[in-house]
């Protein structure tokens, strides 16, 4: 419950809220004092240490970021990859999946279009087919209609927990069960949910999940988190890759590629350290407050708003 949370103190950490009531976190989360100070710390470290900051501070800061996100979703840090965007994440995962002419990927028209775009591009090259389930209302996709499109031909099912257009909470667990029956990978876009709705990736047996700092995780742009279930990591070999996927990237060996045994194998280039600093503070804010508390508070405020309009 929320009795032990001082919401006014938390609110005071966001200077923007001194001026306005903000209702657009679904587009961009506000900057907290902690995240602003973290950005200044990054600048000071860069100014003071130059390139040596990579080894004294920055690489460890990236690892700390993985630990914080893993804590939030009940995963291990080794199951987390740091990516620059969901588009990059889906491109890497797509490159791990061999698609024959008759193989299928199932998504919906309410899921963020970067998912369909990636596989549409492959479809144009004769690599699989994309089935995009339509919505009658543009608010939600009928779950039974969605699962009717999943078959033994399906290689990947990709959908959202919260639809970005409407905020509707999708019954993804029902979809996941049917994907599992048909031995298809399940990819959950959780960008509009993580931080405001609790999730336990182990309890739900999710294969792959992406989220990011831009919205409800209060970290700003340039950071996406990708969870890949431990049992899947070594089964997936990306062809969209980069030097940070290598087990020993600092050997700078162009002759061999030996992927990391962790989810780092799905990373590509150098992470944006300027984005890592505020993103870590955003995650700490969410973890310290507690997602269950945030959810209860959101429902309470929503109820007050609805009742005031009746």
Feature map (PLM): residue ranges:
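Pyridoxal 5′-phosphate
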Residues: 1-310
């Amino acid at each position: 419950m929320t009795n032990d949370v001082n919401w006014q103190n938390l609110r005071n950490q966001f200077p923007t809220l001194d001026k306005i009531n903000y209702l657009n976190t679904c587009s961009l989360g506000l900057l907290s004092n902690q995240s602003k100070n973290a950005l200044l710390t990054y600048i000071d470290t860069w100014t003071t240490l130059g390139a040596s900051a990579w080894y004294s501070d920055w690489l460890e800061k990236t690892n700390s970021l993985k630990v914080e996100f893993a804590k939030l979703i009940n995963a291990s840090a080794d199951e987390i990859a740091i990516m620059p965007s969901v588009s990059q994440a889906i491109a890497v995962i797509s490159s791990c999946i061999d698609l024959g002419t008759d193989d299928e990927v199932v998504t919906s028209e309410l899921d963020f279009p970067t998912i369909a775009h990636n596989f549409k591009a492959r479809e144009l090259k004769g690599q699989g087919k994309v089935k995009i389930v339509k919505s009658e209302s543009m608010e939600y996709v009928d779950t039974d209609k969605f699962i009717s499109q999943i078959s033994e031909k399906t290689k990947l099912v990709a959908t959202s927990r919260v639809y970005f257009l409407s905020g509707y909470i999708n019954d993804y667990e029902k979809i996941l069960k049917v994907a599992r029956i048909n031995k298809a990978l399940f990819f959950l876009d959780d960008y509009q949910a993580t931080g405001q709705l609790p999730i336990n990736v182990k309890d739900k047996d999710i294969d792959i999940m992406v989220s990011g700092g831009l919205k409800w995780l209060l970290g700003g742009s340039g950071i996406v988190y990708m969870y890949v279930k431990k049992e899947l990591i070594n089964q997936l070999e990306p062809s969209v890759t980069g030097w940070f996927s290598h087990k020993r990237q600092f050997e700078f060996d162009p002759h061999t590629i030996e992927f990391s045994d962790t989810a780092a194998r799905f990373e590509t280039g150098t992470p944006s350290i300027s984005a890592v600093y505020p993103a870590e503070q955003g995650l700490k804010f969410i973890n310290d407050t507690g997602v269950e508390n945030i959810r209860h508070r959101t429902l309470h405020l929503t109820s007050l708003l609805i009742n005031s309009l009746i």
